[in-house]
């Protein structure tokens, strides 16, 4: 199952949501691969605290697209909290942009389902080649939206393109929401996008601080509303019943409590 996290506009928290949603799925026992296909401005490795990406011996997505590495050589296991995820990072080095063949992204999308039950793709913003590949070759897409004029306008275009190519639109996440300043609420955005709101994540300085320091907020602050919202979305994507979701939440809470005593 490939689920691409998309947005018509940059800076809306798409990468942060992709990383933390991937960890939420891993936390309920799912095999997860998180992929960065933002070719020009990749940030996923930074959000996940992978400071060793550029100095490591293994490859990145850019090397695969340049024909210099096999896909399996670019996928790395990452211990995050009490779970493990697979990550296919993109390179942060400018020189790796040379000779990248984005047409090879189709081959990547056809191959990545073999590596995990759930593949979460951090798409590039907008409607460039890599963003269109994420929309066209995924089983489902989740839009990340913020309640701002520019973001809404760009996301309306993204949704229009997604519908034209018959993409499986799962819904949208309303991110960085503030009741006092938002020009629209979740219900109004459902009408605008003709799609379901999967969850609302309120503006929270702790999230920004975690993102800036490369620490997933779902691990640092597992009980804040944003973390609980992503866990509910993960349970929904996994097809868990309400009872299974409650049991998973209990197990996660117990695991977090036990980890405190091990410190």
Label the predicted regions:
Residues 10, 64, 88, 122, ...:
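Residue-level signature of catalytic and energy-coupling elements of molecular machines
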Residues 103-107, 111-114, 118-209:
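Conserved catalytic-core segment of NTP-binding enzymes
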Residues 18, 57, 101, 105, ...:
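Short, conserved glycine- and acidic-residue-centered signature motifs
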Residues 37-114, 211-213, 219:
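P-loop/Walker-type NTP enzyme "switch/lid" segment
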Residues 4, 16, 87-89, 173:
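Soluble periplasmic/extracytoplasmic beta-strand elements of cell-envelope proteins
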Residues 2-40:
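Walker A/P-loop phosphate-binding motif and the immediately C-terminal alpha-helix
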Residues 164-263:
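C-terminal lobe/tail of nucleotide-utilizing enzymes
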Residues 2, 85-87, 197-200:
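Conserved beta-strand scaffold positions in the cores of enzyme catalytic domains, especially
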């Amino acid at each position: 199952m490939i689920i691409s996290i998309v947005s018509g506009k940059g800076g809306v928290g798409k990468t942060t949501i992709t990383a933390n949603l991937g960890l939420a799925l891993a936390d309920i026992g799912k095999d997860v691969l998180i992929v960065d296909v933002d070719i020009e401005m990749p940030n996923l490795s930074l959000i996940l605290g992978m400071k060793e990406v550029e100095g490591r011996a293994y490859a990145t997505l850019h090397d695969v697209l340049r024909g210099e590495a096999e896909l399996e050589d670019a996928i790395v296991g990452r211990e995050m909290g009490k779970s493990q995820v697979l990550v296919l990072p993109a390179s942060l080095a400018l020189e790796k942009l040379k000779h990248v063949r984005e047409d090879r992204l189709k081959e990547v999308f056809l191959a990545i389902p073999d590596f995990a039950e759930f593949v979460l793709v951090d798409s590039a913003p907008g409607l460039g080649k890599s963003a269109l590949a994420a929309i066209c070759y995924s089983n489902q897409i989740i839009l990340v939206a913020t309640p701002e004029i520019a973001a809404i306008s760009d996301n309306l275009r993204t949704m229009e393109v997604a519908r034209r190519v018959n993409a499986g639109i799962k819904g949208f996440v309303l991110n960085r929401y503030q009741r006092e300043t938002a020009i629209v609420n979740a219900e109004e955005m459902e009408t605008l996008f003709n799609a379901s709101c999967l969850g609302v994540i309120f503006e929270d300085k702790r999230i920004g601080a975690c993102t800036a320091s490369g620490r997933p907020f779902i691990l640092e602050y597992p009980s804040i509303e944003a973390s609980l919202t992503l866990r509910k979305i993960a349970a929904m994507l996994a097809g868990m019943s309400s009872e299974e979701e409650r049991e998973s939440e209990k197990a996660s809470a117990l695991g977090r409590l036990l980890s405190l005593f091990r410190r």
